[in-house]
A protein has these predicted regions:
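Phosphate/dinucleotide-binding and metal-coordinating scaffold of catalytic cores
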Residues: 1-268
């Protein structure tokens, strides 16, 4: 049988090859931080949102068997002395306007608790007026895509708007991530000591987006990236406490006295 040799493919003349300009490959540490700045234009945060919070005592199993007076009495340091977790109560969060809850908003037309409530903050927890963390239960919806609603009173700041103003300014700064904020007029109805109570005006709060894995993803960042809550603002090295998890002497409790791990545990 005859064998026919394959014809060689025609070569491309050098003059027909185009050279394109490519961006140089960047080292990972040289890539600028970018967040989704469009996120800040989804909702109008220039006004004031009205929230109605009905608090009631729950049960021991969920740790909500407390009164509203207890929630507002103890500071973080009191809980540390007692060696217990922060007290919580049941909460029914409803969002609306100055007339009441509004159709389409979280909690509308609901009568059973959809959240838990506890104080938030560290030194601010010693103030007479507390900051609150409202955690919407799973399956009970979200508010602006958030299940955790952090309300800050800013008692130490006479004007009460500097915190929000700072976050608003951060929105326009490249390579700096911010958090969504909203002024909130809060009304609270306390049913922990009986029924029939009316809503009490708690005044103006600043709602600040909870920085967690959900927020990282929402802002276009790595959901599994490094994220820490700073518990000590002295910013010393603390070699004896701040160690890698691979270090035989690593102690999570000592590490989190300074930095509480909220994301990846890879501390490199």
């Amino acid at each position: 049988a005859e064998h026919t040799a394959a014809e060689p493919e025609p070569s491309t003349p050098e003059s027909a090859v185009q050279t394109v300009e490519k961006e140089p490959v960047q080292e990972i540490n040289g890539i600028p931080l970018r967040e989704n700045k469009d996120l800040y234009s989804v909702y109008d945060d220039s006004g004031i949102v009205t929230m109605y919070l009905t608090v009631s005592s729950g049960n021991e199993a969920e740790g909500t068997n407390h009164t509203w007076a207890e929630i507002n009495h103890y500071s973080v340091y009191d809980y540390e002395k007692m060696g217990v977790e922060r007290y919580q109560v049941n909460g029914l969060l409803q969002v609306g306007d100055e007339n009441g809850p509004v159709v389409g908003e979280v909690g509308y037309n609901e009568i059973v608790p959809n959240a838990t409530v506890q104080i938030r903050g560290q030194t601010s927890s010693t103030n007479d007026q507390k900051n609150y963390k409202i955690e919407l239960k799973k399956g009970k919806g979200t508010w602006r895509g958030q299940r955790t609603i952090a309300l800050n009173k800013h008692m130490g700041e006479g004007l009460r708007f500097r915190n929000k103003m700072a976050y608003d300014l951060i929105e326009g700064i490249p390579q700096m991530t911010g958090l969504r904020t909203q002024f909130v007029h809060l009304y609270v109805r306390d049913l922990t000591t009986g029924s029939g109570a009316a809503f009490e005006d708690y005044g103006l709060y600043t709602q600040v987006e909870q920085l967690n894995k959900t927020a990282l993803k929402t802002h276009g960042l790595d959901r599994n990236g490094q994220l820490y809550k700073v518990n000590s603002f002295e910013f010393q090295r603390y070699e004896d406490d701040l160690k890698l998890t691979t270090d035989p002497d690593y102690d999570e409790k000592k590490f989190e006295q300074h930095l509480e791990t909220k994301g990846s545990s890879d501390h490199t």
